[in-house]
Curated annotation (Swiss-Prot):
Almost completely overlaps RPL8B. Residues 1-22 form the signal peptide. It comes from Saccharomyces cerevisiae (strain ATCC 204508 / S288c). The lineage of its organism: Eukaryota, Fungi, Dikarya, Ascomycota, Saccharomycotina. This is Putative uncharacterized protein YLL044W. The keyword Signal applies. The keyword Signal applies. Keywords: Signal.
């Protein structure tokens, strides 16, 4: 059925092209008149009917074929490597500092201890002034922003 409809469309298109590009002007006018008149609407209706028939037929084929589904139980472990098991000891190796990043009180206390240890190591603990305070507070602020 598909081949027959396509052959008839191909035949009519080749006939119209020959009439259009022929030497005599009367054939050119007649072919345009034929092409623009009722022939075009009949051709469009037939093509729409053909396309809807094909889509309905394909939907019926799909709906009738759903009953034949079966699960494939073979090769279920292809995506997994069966010789490698999950390392159960990895969760025990995670250090506790990862948990402290979520706890803001612990995080701030550790950062403040780190800043105070830097102050003690640099020798600024004996000579404390406002400029040192502003410098270290700026450093503390930069560290806190970089942690987030």
């Amino acid at each position: 059925m598909v081949q027959t409809v396509l052959n008839s469309v191909w035949l009519w298109r080749s006939v119209l092209l020959r009439l259009t590009f022929s030497d005599s002007g009367s054939f050119l006018g007649q072919s345009f008149l034929l092409f623009s008149s009722g022939f075009w609407s009949v051709l469009v209706e037939q093509l729409e009917g053909f396309s809807s028939g094909v889509s309905v037929q394909s939907v019926l084929e799909l709906s009738n074929g759903w009953r034949n589904l079966q699960s494939d139980g073979q090769d279920l472990l292809l995506s997994l490597q069966s010789d490698i098991f999950w390392p159960f000891d990895v969760s025990g190796q995670v250090s506790l500092w990862l948990d402290s990043l979520a706890n803001t009180e612990v995080l701030w206390s550790r950062v403040s201890q780190w800043v105070l240890s830097l102050v003690r190591l640099s020798g600024l603990s004996t000579e404390w002034s406002w400029s040192n305070f502003l410098t270290w507070s700026h450093l503390f602020f930069q560290l806190s922003c970089s942690l987030y």
